Amino acid sequence: MAAMTNSSFEPLGRVRTKIVATLGPASRDPATLRKLVEAGVDVFRLNFSHASHDEHSATLQAIRKIGEESGRQLAVLQDLCGPKIRLGDIPGDVVECDFGAEFCLAAERKEGDDPHQLTCTYKTLTDDLEIGQSVLFADGTVAMDVIDRGPGWAHLKVTLPGRIRSHQGINVPSAALSVAALTDKDLVDLDWTAQHGVEYVGLSFVRQVEDITRLREELDRRKIRARIVAKIEKPQAVANLEAIVAEADAVMVARGDLGVEIDVSRVPAVQKQIIATCHKARIPVITATQMLNSMESSSRPTRAEASDVFNAVLDGTDAVMLSGETAIGQYPVESVATMSQIAREAENLMFSEFRLNAPWTWSVDNWPGANGRGHQATPSVARAGQVLPVTDAVVEAASAVCRRLNAALLVVATHSGRTALASSKQRNATPTLALTDDLEAARAMGLYWGVTALHIPELFETGQVLAWADDWCRANDLIASGDRVVIVRGVIPNNPNHNALLVHEVE
């Protein structure tokens, strides 16, 4: 049985919005990892575009150890590199791109050291280009138009001047590239996953449902139980959003490449659309990229960054993510603490009298851009991360009971975590404690808004769950005599009981 006391469990004090932190040279050492957890990190992102397998293995081992020592169920997100198209080596490493200057992009460099000869990692890119298309470099800071092309080459003319360096990114927003969603490197990285285990695998540059299906086949082939996070960063993914969300287990609003692939003025609206669609489908959504970007080199964020995090929480994101701020920044711990503080302020407004008495009240089914009220029913047989319709109905009733009775705590007994996920989408003001006998499910709940998970060796009968939760919460000073606790029991394997709801008054 889990320890009866756990000083790290603070459901009444911790922010409900989950925080994802990307690890790198500035943060992967055990001492900093521990400080990040104390500051509020719930999910650690391992970026497989950088670092070796040995480095990732050591980092993962440190995360697991800290999780055990702190009593926190920490989720790990493995972010696959995907088919990111980059420049090859440039003679001198950097070249100025003056307005009107011409460059040749080819699969292979000809003899000589002319910096106006460019190569890229995707050898058939030039075959996918058309005359008149715009090619973007270095996150869109440099643009060139295709003025001529032939087998294996394309002539480009600079329309947006700037500077490019070796290995910087290339984007072609209007091109339908034939590159596969999973690269050979990704498959090797999945072999690592099969040996070590993570809770989430991020798929980069998703364009269509088939990309997710392919990854799921590779996970199944390797017997990997990880949930799939579809990263929305291509215009094709936005066009196929509802189908992608229906197949994925979670979604990331990857605003970096998304802001290059579509006009930056559209990004806020698309962000709201993605979040609303994920709520409709009852899956977690992460808002990512440049949220506190200035904190890579400053101990305080800009006012605009604070507003960005605040409004993402009000939009309904389940999690907010830090990238360079924690991976390579000078203030990784301060970045997490700042993000937590901003999220707390947003949640205070979310549950304030002002917000509740607004012209329209907060509701996952009443969110602007959700394409209609209600949500799509999921199949009667669902994946681990999917919410069943009957489960959704029970937790909706439980949320209403919590509000009516001003409950002190909502306890969810679940095996797969579906019931806890459904509860998180209700956005309860009541703290939620999830009990599960599945360690991987407990860790995965690190991404679920407002849910604090505990791993226990077995799920008991409803009466035993009640007694266990009562004793545990008393030992941690979470409830007192006269408090009401609402208990929801999900579907338990090999148990004839279905979803159940009861109210317990603490004696």
Describe the role of every protein-language-model region.
Residues M1-E507:
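Non-catalytic helical/linker scaffolds that mediate oligomerization, partner binding
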